[in-house]
From Swiss-Prot:
Chief subcellular location: nucleus
Name of the protein this chain belongs to: Protein FAM124B
Summary of subunit composition and partner proteins: Interacts with CHD7 and CHD8.
Cellular component terms (Gene Ontology): nucleoplasm
Pfam families hit by this protein: FAM124 (PF15067)
Organismal lineage: Eukaryota, Metazoa, Chordata, Craniata, Vertebrata
Length: 461
C-alpha cells in the first residue's frame, strides 16, 4: 500500500463578505474536485461586515495583481474535463479579469493573450493552461516587485524550511505537495522594473511552522499574534501571511503560551541567521521593549498599509472572521495583539496564579480552527490586563512569600528594625523598596545579615 504524502504546509484563506462564504467555498470545491480531490487548499471565511477598498490612482506606474492561481491540465486525460473547467470559470460567481486598467492601457505583457478569472477584485486571479506531458500542477504565484524578488525567495525559503525546487533569474517555485499525477507549487515571479504590486487584501497565505520564536526576529515586518496558535505578518510586497504554530511541549511551548511574547518584533532585532536561546530571547525582548517604548507601532491583524503608505482597514478593530460553516474568529483582537512580559519578573507562586487565571480566560476566548471552520469554544470578552494579576499585586502589596520567608527571632527583629528605618521615607521610596523586596527575596535564597545591611545602606545613599 502506497503511503499518502503529508498534507501541504500552505493553505490559502479567502475572506468573503457575509452571506457569500458558502457559495464561494462550494464553487472552489467543485472546480478543484477533479484536479486535487485529496487536499483542500482553499478555505473561505466570512467577515461580519463588508469592507470597502479604496484604490489610489497610479498614473505613472502600472499595477499588477499580487497573486494568481494557474491550473496546468493534461490534454490526454480528456477534452471534456478541460472544457468543464473552462466552462465553470465563465459562469457566475466567476468574473472575467479585465485585460485593461482604469486608464484604458493594457496590462503588462505577462498577462498578454491570456484569459484570467476572479471571484472578487481582492482575491487571486485564476487561469487554465494545457500541458502535454508530466504531472498536472496547481501553481500559486506571488508576483514580486523588481527590487524585492531576491529577498522574497529567501523569506519563503526560511518559512518553508526548504530551498526552491527550481530557481531562475526572474522565476522560481517550491514544490509543497506531490503525487504521481499532481503537484502543488508556490512560485515567485519577478515583475518588470517600474511595475508595482497590487496585494490582494482578501487573500491570506497560511504556513505551518514548528517554531515561531526564532522566526519572528528575521521577518521583514512586525509579526503579531491573532490567536493562540496563529501569528500574522506580511512579505516585502504587502501580501498577508499567517504562521500557524504546531504546538509541541518538547519545544518549549507550555499551556499554549507562545515562546516569543512580544508581537511587535521586526527584522532589526537580530542579524540574519542568528539563533536564540530562551534566556537570550527574553533579554532581547526586554532591551527592545525599552528602545521602542516611545515608538508607536500600531499593527493589527486586518489593518495593513497600502503600497502608497495609507493604511487600509478591513473593518474596525473588532472585525470578526466567520467561516462558511457559521463560526467566528476574531481577526484583530486588540487585547491579544500586545502580550506582556510582566509575568517573567514574578516569583514562581505568583506566576502560577497568573498563568492559571490566563488559562481560565483563554477557555472563554473564541478560537476558530480555520482549517475546519468550527469554533472550538464560546466567545467572551477578555479581561483587562490588570485584572489578570492577583489582588495583592494589583494593590502594590508584596506577595505572601515575604511573610513566610523570615523565620526565627533574629529575622523578626531585623525585620522590625528595617521597617522602622523605612517608615520616615516618602511613599515613592516605599513603593520602590517593595519592588526590590519582590525581585530579590522571593525567587532567590534569603541573604545573610551582612548583605541585608549593605542593601539598606545602598538604599539610603
Amino acid at each position: 500500500m502506497d503511503e499518502m504524502p503529508e498534507p501541504p504546509a500552505m493553505t490559502v484563506h479567502l475572506l468573503a463578505n457575509a452571506g457569500q462564504g458558502l457559495l464561494l467555498q462550494q464553487t472552489l470545491d467543485q472546480l478543484l474536485d477533479c484536479i486535487c480531490p485529496d487536499i483542500r487548499l482553499f478555505l473561505v471565511s466570512e467577515r461580519a461586515s463588508p469592507v470597502k477598498y479604496y484604490d489610489k490612482c497610479h498614473s505613472k506606474r502600472s499595477r499588477f495583481p499580487g497573486m494568481s492561481v494557474l491550473l496546468f491540465l493534461k490534454e490526454n486525460l480528456g477534452e471534456e474535463r478541460l472544457f468543464h473547467v473552462l466552462d465553470s470559470l465563465q459562469h457566475w460567481p466567476w468574473q472575467c479579469y479585465p485585460t485593461q486598467n482604469a486608464q484604458g492601457r493594457p496590462c503588462p505583457y505577462i498577462l498578454a493573450n491570456q484569459e484570467f478569472y476572479s471571484l472578487d477584485s481582492q482575491m487571486p486571479i485564476w487561469g487554465v493552461r494545457q500541458v502535454h506531458c508530466g504531472t498536472e500542477i496547481l501553481r500559486v504565484t506571488l508576483y514580486c516587485s523588481f527590487d524585492n524578488y531576491e529577498d522574497a525567495i529567501r523569506l519563503y525559503a526560511m518559512i518553508l524550511q526548504r530551498e526552491a525546487t527550481l530557481q531562475k533569474s526572474n522565476f522560481c517555485f517550491f514544490v509543497l505537495y506531490s503525487t504521481e499525477t499532481f503537484a502543488l507549487q508556490l512560485s515567485l515571479k519577478q515583475l518588470p522594473l517600474g511595475t508595482s504590486v497590487d496585494p490582494k487584501e482578501a487573500s491570506v497565505l497560511q504556513f505551518k511552522v514548528q517554531e515561531i520564536g526564532q522566526l519572528v526576529p528575521l521577518l521583514p515586518h512586525p509579526c503579531v499574534p491573532i490567536s493562540r496558535t496563529r501569528w500574522q505578518t506580511q512579505d516585502y510586497d504587502g501580501n498577508k501571511i499567517l504562521l500557524q504554530v504546531q504546538l509541541n511541549p518538547g519545544l518549549g511551548v507550555r499551556n499554549g503560551e507562545p515562546p516569543f511574547l512580544n508581537g511587535t518584533l521586526g527584522a532589526d532585532t537580530l542579524p540574519h541567521g542568528s539563533r536564540l536561546t530562551p534566556v537570550s530571547a527574553i533579554r532581547t525582548l526586554e532591551l527592545r521593549s525599552r528602545r521602542i517604548r516611545g515608538r508607536r507601532f500600531k499593527v493589527s491583524s486586518v489593518e495593513l498599509p497600502e503600497p502608497g503608505g495609507r493604511p487600509v482597514s478591513d473593518g474596525s478593530s473588532n472585525t470578526w472572521w466567520k467561516s462558511a460553516g457559521g463560526s467566528a474568529q476574531p481577526s484583530s483582537p486588540a487585547t491579544e495583539s500586545q502580550p506582556q512580559l510582566s509575568s517573567l519578573h514574578l516569583e514562581p507562586g505568583a506566576r502560577m496564579k497568573v498563568l492559571g487565571r490566563e488559562n481560565s480566560f483563554e477557555k472563554l476566548e473564541a478560537e476558530t480552527n480555520v482549517d475546519t471552520g468550527f469554533t472550538m469554544v464560546s466567545s467572551e470578552p477578555r479581561p483587562s490586563f490588570a485584572s489578570r494579576f492577583p489582588r495583592n499585586l494589583q494593590t502594590h502589596q508584596p506577595p505572601s512569600c515575604l511573610s513566610t520567608s523570615f523565620s526565627g527571632s533574629a529575622a523578626s527583629k531585623n525585620n522590625r528594625i528595617f521597617k522602622e528605618r523605612v517608615h520616615p521615607l516618602p511613599l515613592a521610596g516605599q513603593r520602590d523598596l517593595g519592588a526590590k523586596k519582590i525581585l530579590s527575596k522571593c525567587p532567590l535564597p534569603l541573604p545573610v545579615q551582612g548583605e541585608a545591611k549593605e542593601a539598606e545602606e545602598e538604599f539610603f545613599i
